């Protein structure tokens, strides 16, 4: 799956066409159905405006919201998105009470002069995800013929398909892979994601550094395996570093996080040497007597080990210097997972110092890519998203891409 040869919205002629766009409007709502964070809607505006500015007959927007489990549930209606979308676009938006069917088709076919239509939640139909769970966790599969019918219903609403929902690209859902139109192109959000991940995974400027943090090694096994073949330097930090320290260096880690399942793969990191990959691990630690923001703190080093009854929740100053050296040497930096428990101020220093170093690097021309999830939360917490080359919007999707997996929503796009 090449990331760099996919058709993009700027490659297609939209004039006079019904443009069907899969967006990600899965936004948080409060109890009064008011949007508490509009970032995802803001992110889709350039793609929608491009279609309107280039003469689209109509722009038809489809999205999911929450997990209604294949049934209509007013709690998850997309209707509350309409006022915010109208405000950001500066024009009226028609809301369709369903996402397929004759009523929706007639709304879409009657639209003209760049009308914008928002369809109701795709996941009100079991055919979108292909299955649903009841409250006891029992799974029901969607009927194959009905899934086909649903996909035909979506296809009937457009002449050109644009996918701008990178965060759902790892899901083979009907709206991601089942729209059967001759031209299927990436929107601006999707294109930016693909361009930056191609820069890292297909043609990185070297030296290429990956910083992998977070808690569990077992969550990152495939990621480590895939990246060991691509990077020049690998920093392993955060909670998962303690499993490496215990297994590879036999260092006492007290009550620090130890991942039994992940421990079995640490020896494979000895392969790093064979692959000429420099492996950087922390060498000193900020410790705590309990997992709590108000815990008593201490310090430990590799020489002393972490005493019984204490756990490492952040790295110390010497480790930060090692990370900074690796960042200074690199030209391409990919960061996935924090360097400590950044949610607690006492243990946020390692993550903050690493962030400061990559922001500085970016200012000096390095390519810095933040791979979604907790690390994107860190960038947002310190308000530096616009000071980095790219902060991914897809936690699960970016992780699967970095693991070397094909993303169904990307595979489904037309090639140039």
Swiss-Prot record:
One matching Pfam family: PGK
Binding positions for ADP per the UniProt entry: 214, 238, 342
EC number: 2.7.2.3
Disulfide cysteine pairs (residue numbers): none
Annotated binding of (2R)-3-phosphoglycerate, by residue: 23-26, 39-40, 63-64, 66-67, 122-123, 170-171
Pathway annotation from the record: Carbohydrate degradation; glycolysis; pyruvate from D-glyceraldehyde 3-phosphate: step 2/5
Keyword Transport: no
Protein's cellular compartments: Cytoplasm; Mitochondrion
First-tier enzyme category under EC: transferase
Amino-acid positions noted as binding Mg(2+) in the UniProt annotation, renumbered to this chain: 215, 219, 374
Subunit structure: Monomer.
Similarity section: Belongs to the phosphoglycerate kinase family.
Protein name: Phosphoglycerate kinase
Species whose genome carries this gene: Hypocrea jecorina
């Amino acid at each position: 799956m090449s990331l760099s040869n996919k058709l993009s919205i700027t490659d297609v002629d939209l004039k006079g066409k019904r443009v069907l766009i899969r967006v990600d409007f899965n936004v948080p709502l409060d109890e009064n159905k008011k949007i508490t964070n509009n970032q995802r809607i803001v992110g889709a505006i350039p793609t929608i405006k491009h279609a309107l500015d280039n003469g689209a007959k109509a722009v038809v927007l489809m999205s999911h919201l929450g997990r209604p489990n294949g049934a209509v549930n007013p709690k998850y209606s997309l209707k509350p998105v309409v006022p915010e979308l109208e405000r950001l676009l500066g024009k009226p938006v028609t809301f369709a009470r369903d996402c397929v069917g004759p009523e929706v088709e007639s709304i879409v076919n009657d639209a003209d002069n760049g009308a914008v239509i928002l369809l109701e939640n795709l996941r009100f139909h079991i055919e979108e995800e292909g299955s649903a769970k009841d409250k006891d966790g029992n799974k029901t599969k969607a009927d194959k013929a009905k899934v086909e019918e649903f996909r035909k219903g979506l296809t009937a609403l457009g002449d050109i398909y644009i996918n701008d929902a990178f965060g759902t690209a790892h899901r083979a859902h009907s709206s991601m892979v089942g729209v059967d139109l001759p031209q299927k192109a990436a929107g601006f959000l999707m294109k930016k994601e693909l361009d930056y991940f191609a820069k890292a995974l297909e043609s990185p400027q070297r030296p290429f550094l990956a910083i992998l943090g977070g808690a569990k090694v077992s969550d990152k096994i495939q990621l480590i395996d895939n990246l060991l073949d691509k990077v020049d330097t690998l920093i392993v930090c955060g909670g998962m570093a303690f499993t490496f320290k215990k297994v590879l260096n036999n260092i006492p880690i007290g009550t620090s996080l130890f991942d039994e399942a992940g421990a079995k793969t640490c020896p494979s990191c000895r392969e790093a040497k064979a692959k000429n990959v420099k492996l950087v691990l922390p060498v000193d630690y900020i410790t705590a007597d309990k997992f709590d923001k108000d815990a008593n703190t201490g310090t430990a080093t590799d020489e002393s080990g972490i005493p019984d009854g204490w756990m490492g929740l952040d790295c110390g100053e010497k480790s930060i210097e090692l990370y900074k050296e690796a960042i200074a040497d690199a030209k391409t930096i990919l960061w996935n997972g924090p360097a400590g428990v950044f949610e607690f101020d006492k243990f946020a220093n390692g993550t903050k110092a690493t962030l400061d170093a990559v922001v500085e690097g970016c200012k000096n021309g390095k390519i810095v890519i933040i791979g979604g999830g907790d690390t994107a939360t860190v960038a947002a917490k310190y308000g530096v998203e616009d000071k980095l080359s790219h902060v991914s919007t897809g936690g699960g999707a970016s992780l699967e891409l970095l693991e070397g997996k094909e993303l169904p929503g990307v595979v489904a796009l037309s090639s140039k």
